[in-house]
């Protein structure tokens, strides 16, 4: 165990630098706003800065912990499931995994508290059942080699048909639920499951199908909340604003975070427990890993736990009040439109601070053998989230229904999916769920809520939906990146095909078609 801890120290330093690069731009933007057009109280600023420190340290531990534990656990469980060749076992365990992991997702508790017209347990269990059901659908797709785009057309078509019968107050929350439930606890494990299942297949399309699980799992919660929206009255939906902190000295500042810490210690422990228990069962029955591997996974789980506790404490206690207050000040400064470009700037950088984004980017780079670099993936996500936040702020200022954005957005995203390589489509729809994590829920959503309060809008219908918007635009930007790569590859092949003709060496008419058009 000591050797494992010592070996992880250089990696921790590397992860610390990555975390600083992700969080410092957000801190810089907020500080510039605080000292210029959006003055805030010292209490809120100090809470924000201490929250930023906790988030940096938390991301450092979480990203390394996920590499050491969540990813290998998911890959091994997925491989064992597929190797069993028993479809009822694969689907049954898949449903159970999806259900248990979702119940333990911390962000789902936050969503449930924002929808008082539906009992918390009813909402949580319905959403968890939706994720479990669609995880089994995702497993079936991978095992049978079914293309992702037709499934997306069918399921999102059903979503928008149901949306026509749901009260307006439920629409934004329903679409938010799809992004909220694919958070830092769910994503690493589910993505690793996909890699494990596809690795056993071993055919030429296995890498393409290793992504797409998060994409399908995001549909389940949306359908669940829409169905609940038809069954429950929306008149009781209310918005509970976050309490703005007031501290007079450093001791009170620490006490504020110290009071929130036990809650997140308990939340994350209950979140990790189902995954650990499930892995323990697999270890006893089928895996039987050696002690060194188990020791590495145990250290990784400890890092994951510490990282998530620190990140969520910093985000909820430090970032959430700051986001809400900044939104109120910016939208109430006499030039409310200024929140649109500022929101876009914050959105561009804040996605880099999402813990699960690191897992996605790294896995994409590994599965594609570097064809899609983590840097390129990060830029596509940042561009998508920036556009999302800008559109969300337009909604806050105008009160336009979220469907005017989501229906065209998903139509474009699904339309593109039929012309880009399958791998890019699966990655793009996974990226949408990954980008809308805890940083979106604890900073961007409060920013929109604060702005909505300042302009006198309806919080439930106009401010909610930020998570849904953030989950939508990466579907388009990542696929456009794939389309650009496809066109670039096509031009290179065309240039290579033209060289013999230009040199008068050989006739290209006899070349096999596959050499010319296969991408």
Go through each PLM region and give its residues.
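Signature of multi-pass transmembrane helix bundles
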Residues: 1-64, 79-80, 178, 191, ...
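Small-residue-rich segments of transmembrane alpha-helices in multi-pass membrane proteins
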Residues: 26-30, 58, 86-94, 154-165, ...
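Transmembrane alpha-helix boundary signature
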Residues: 39, 62-73, 99-111, 168-170, ...
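Transmembrane helix-loop boundary segments of multi-pass membrane transporters
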Residues: 46-47, 65, 112-124, 142-157, ...
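Structural signature of hydrophobic alpha-helical transmembrane segments
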Residues: 48-60, 117-129, 176-190, 242-243, ...
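Helix-loop-helix junctions within the multi-pass membrane cores of secondary transporters/permeases
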Residues: 78-79, 87-158, 336-417
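Alpha-helical transmembrane segments
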Residues: 135, 139-145, 170-171, 195-209, ...
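Hydrophobic alpha-helical transmembrane segments in multi-pass integral membrane proteins
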Residues: 165-173, 225-233, 311-318, 390-391, ...
């Amino acid at each position: 165990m000591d050797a494992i801890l010592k070996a992880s120290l250089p990696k921790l330093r590397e992860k610390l630098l990555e975390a600083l690069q992700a969080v410092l731009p957000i801190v810089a933007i907020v500080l510039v706003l605080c000292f210029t057009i959006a003055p805030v109280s010292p209490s809120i600023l100090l809470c924000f800065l201490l929250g930023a420190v906790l988030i940096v340290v938390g991301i450092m531990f979480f990203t390394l912990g996920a590499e050491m534990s969540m990813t290998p656990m998911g890959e091994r469980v997925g491989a064992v499931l597929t190797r069993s060749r028993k479809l009822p076992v694969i689907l049954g365990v898949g449903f159970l995994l999806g259900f248990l992991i979702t119940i333990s997702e911390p962000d789902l508790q936050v969503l449930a508290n924002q929808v008082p017209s539906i009992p918390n347990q009813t909402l949580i269990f319905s959403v968890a059942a939706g994720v479990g059901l669609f995880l089994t659908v995702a497993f079936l797709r991978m095992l049978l080699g079914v293309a992702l785009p037709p499934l997306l057309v069918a399921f999102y078509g059903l979503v928008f048909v149901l949306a026509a019968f749901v009260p307006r107050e439920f629409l934004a929350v329903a679409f938010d639920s799809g992004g909220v439930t694919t958070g830092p606890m769910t994503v690493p494990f589910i993505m690793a499951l996909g890699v494990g299942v596809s690795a056993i297949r071993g055919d030429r399309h296995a890498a393409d199908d290793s992504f797409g699980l998060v994409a399908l799992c995001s549909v389940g919660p949306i359908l669940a909340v829409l169905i609940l929206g038809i069954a429950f009255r929306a008149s009781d939906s209310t918005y509970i604003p976050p309490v703005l902190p007031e501290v007079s000295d450093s001791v009170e500042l620490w006490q504020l975070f110290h009071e929130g810490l036990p809650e997140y210690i308990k939340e994350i422990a209950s979140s990790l427990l189902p995954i650990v228990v499930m892995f323990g069962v697999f270890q006893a029955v089928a895996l039987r890993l050696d002690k060194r591997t188990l020791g590495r996974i145990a250290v990784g789980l400890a890092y994951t736990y510490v990282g998530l506790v620190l990140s969520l404490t910093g985000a909820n206690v430090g970032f959430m009040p700051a986001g809400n207050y900044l939104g109120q000040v910016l939208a109430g400064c006499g030039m409310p439109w200024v929140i649109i470009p500022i929101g876009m700037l914050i959105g561009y950088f804040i996605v880099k601070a999402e813990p699960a984004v690191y897992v996605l980017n790294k896995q994409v780079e590994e599965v594609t053998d570097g064809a899609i670099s983590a840097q390129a993936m990060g830029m596509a996500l940042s561009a998508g989230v920036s556009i999302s936040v800008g559109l969300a702020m337009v909604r806050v200022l105008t009160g336009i229904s979220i469907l005017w954005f989501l229906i065209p957005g998903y139509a474009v995203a699904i339309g593109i999916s039929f012309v880009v390589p399958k791998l890019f489509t699966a990655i793009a729809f996974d990226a949408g769920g990954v980008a809308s994590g805890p940083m979106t829920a604890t900073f961007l959503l409060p920013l929109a809520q604060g702005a909505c309060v300042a302009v006198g809008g309806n919080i439930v219908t106009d401010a909610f939906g930020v998570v849904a918007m953030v989950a939508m635009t990466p579907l388009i930007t990542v696929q456009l990146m794939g389309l650009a790569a496809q066109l670039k590859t096509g031009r290179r092949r065309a240039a290579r095909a033209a060289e013999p003709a230009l040199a008068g060496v050989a006739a290209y008419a006899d070349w096999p078609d596959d050499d010319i058009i296969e991408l």
